[in-house]
Amino acid sequence: MPNLKSIRDRISTVKNTKKITEAMRLVAAAKVRRAQEQVTATRPFADRLAQVLYGLQARLKFEEVELPLLQERALRKVCLLVVTGDRGLCGAYNSSVIKRAEERSNELKAKGIDYTFVLVGRKAIQYFQRRDQPIEATYGGLEQIPTAQEASEIADELLSLYLSEEVDHVELIYTRFISLVNSRPVVQTLLPLDPDALVVAEEDEVFRLTTRGGQFQVERERMERGTPQEMPSDMIFEQNPIQILDALLPLYLNNQLLRALQESAASELAARMTAMNNASDNASELIGTLTLSYNKARQAAITQELLEVVGGAEALN
């Protein structure tokens, strides 16, 4: 028969663990809200920038535009930018991105194409360093809610590698936020930039974390973008439109990278919230099972004591 004290100790331990997981769930939920606010705050600038780039591209569509960030080169070496988190306790968030990065590197290796990594997040850094993979740069200890400065530092490194022709292609591997319980690691080409893809993008969505019936839920709102308008043919530029486009493309790259970092952060926080919610549910179930075992053990102990008393009384008679 299990010892009553050991069962009580286990129940107490599980209850304390549940308090921790519940607190972590609430913290992650609050940070998911902040991540959403960041995405929403940067959207007007991103939309307007895309509109301007579209107008410039349409204005220059009949001209020979030779800009380094737009030129396709023979594919000899690819830079893989991998974005993970710094901490665990977030389900399969980190392992899914790392697995996708390994799959992509194996695909390149099978084609005889060289590759190198730029790693964001301690989990990716630790994983690929242990496996002696080629690494150009690492970025660990970033803010949980990514900032424009952090995105700019990473973008500068990528631009340096690409413009110096150390790499011919830059691909981003990050986690796209789909829902509170669902996210997907994706591969996206960052460099060279595709002018047509600047505005031919998938429809945007905003996610909002809400509470309903005491449970967290995600509401999604589809954001309709306005139809891009070409600039008037008689518009006069103080600078050459090609020079303006050349100056705006790095800014667009920074914005794309910031958005990817924000989505990755939101995915990590949502995964951690879900993991802690599941842990809390499992703790509640375990507490119920242990309480039942405790009551059975106590009942058995009482029954045993009664039998001993009755047996002693009968022996005296």
Curated annotation (Swiss-Prot):
UniProt subunit comment: F-type ATPases have 2 components, CF(1) - the catalytic core - and CF(0) - the membrane proton channel. CF(1) has five subunits: alpha(3), beta(3), gamma(1), delta(1), epsilon(1). CF(0) has three main subunits: a, b and c.
Matches recorded under NCBIfam families: ATPsyn_F1gamma, PRK05621.1-2
Location, primary (coarse class): membrane
GO cellular component entries: plasma membrane-derived thylakoid membrane; proton-transporting ATP synthase complex
Function (record text): Produces ATP from ADP in the presence of a proton gradient across the membrane. The gamma chain is believed to be important in regulating ATPase activity and the flow of protons through the CF(0) complex.
GO molecular function: ATP binding; proton-transporting ATP synthase activity, rotational mechanism
Keywords: ATP synthesis, CF(1), Hydrogen ion transport, Ion transport, Membrane, Thylakoid, Transport
Localization terms from the record: Cellular thylakoid membrane
Family recorded in the similarity comment: Belongs to the ATPase gamma chain family.
Official protein name in the record: ATP synthase gamma chain
InterPro entries the record matches: ATP_synth_F1_ATPase_gsu (IPR035968), ATP_synth_F1_gsu (IPR000131), ATP_synth_F1_gsu_CS (IPR023632)
Species the sequence originates in: Acaryochloris marina (strain MBIC 11017)
Membrane topology note: Peripheral membrane protein
Gene3D superfamilies assigned: 3.40.1380.10, ATP synthase, gamma subunit, helix hairpin domain (1.10.287.80)
